[in-house]
Regions:
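Hydrophobic alpha-helical transmembrane segments
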Residues: 113, 117-120, 145-192
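Residue-level recognition of pore/gate-forming positions within transmembrane alpha-helices
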Residues: 16, 20, 47-50, 92, ...
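Membrane-interface helix-capping segments at transmembrane helix termini in multi-pass transporters
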Residues: 34-45, 71-83, 93-124, 164-172
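Helix-loop junctions and terminal segments of transmembrane helices
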Residues: 57-72
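Membrane-interface junctions at transmembrane-helix termini in multi-pass inner-membrane proteins
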Residues: 123-145
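Interhelical loop/hinge segments that connect adjacent transmembrane helices in multipass membrane
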Residues: 1-5, 141, 168-175, 184-209
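Signature of the first transmembrane helix
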Residues: 4-61, 100, 155
Length: 209
């Protein structure tokens, strides 16, 4: 059996196990420590955050993964990587600005504004994490490692510092820290392992994405 296939299979297996185990551990812990009301407010805020993530991610990861898989040349991969990251960065700025406006005008969101502000790191970390690149080059181990970082850091911080319902806002903050750490790790791998630099893309490259 192909070595790369075995490696990717093992990486995906570990990834799926990780994605299953961490929620099983953390959700009962949070409901117990925060209580139903505080946990409900956190969960509602997180759902809004994920809507923004879905909008920013929409279509990009599939098309970008395909483009990376079709082009093995360093020059083209660097252009694709830079273009996708640039567009996502612009979208992050626009949608985070819109989120701040929503917080200021919608009373339900305004009352828990700090949750959304702390959740901005989740939006940035998840949308700018180049998992699509690793999928395109079939290097799933880096996704598994980054995902483990994303899951482990919040878990440890939550267990150490979340004591009661007043700490609900910190759950969002700790998750943001985890996503930002995973994003940073992934970007460093792209930069130093695969020697891809971020360059301002040409207008025609932006239009093709």
């Amino acid at each position: 059996m192909n070595k790369k296939l075995i490696e990717n299979f093992c990486s995906l297996s570990v990834l799926n196990i990780t994605n299953y185990i961490f929620p099983v551990v953390i959700i009962p812990f949070l409901t117990n420590r925060l209580g139903s009301e505080s946990y409900g407010r956190y969960a509602f805020s997180l759902s809004i955050i994920h809507y923004f993530i879905l909008i920013i991610q929409y279509g990009f990861d599939l098309s970008a993964t395909r483009d990376i898989a079709l082009h093995s040349e360093h020059y083209y991969r660097q252009n694709i990587y830079s273009t996708v990251m640039f567009i996502k960065l612009v979208f992050n700025i626009l949608f985070i600005t819109f989120l701040v406006l929503m917080i200021s005008v919608i009373p339900l969101m305004n009352s828990d504004g700090i949750l959304y502000i702390y959740g901005v790191g989740i939006i940035v970390g998840q949308t700018l994490c180049p998992f699509w690149f690793f999928q395109g080059i079939e290097k799933m181990k880096f996704i598994t490692i980054a995902n483990f970082v994303i899951r482990l850091i919040p878990l440890l911080l939550i267990i150490l510092y979340v004591k009661d319902s007043a700490d609900g806002k910190y759950v969002m903050l700790f998750q943001s820290i985890g996503f930002m750490a995973g994003m940073l790790f992934s970007m460093l791998v792209v930069r130093f392992e695969f020697k891809l630099k971020f360059v301002i893309p040409q207008k025609k490259m932006i239009q093709t994405q």
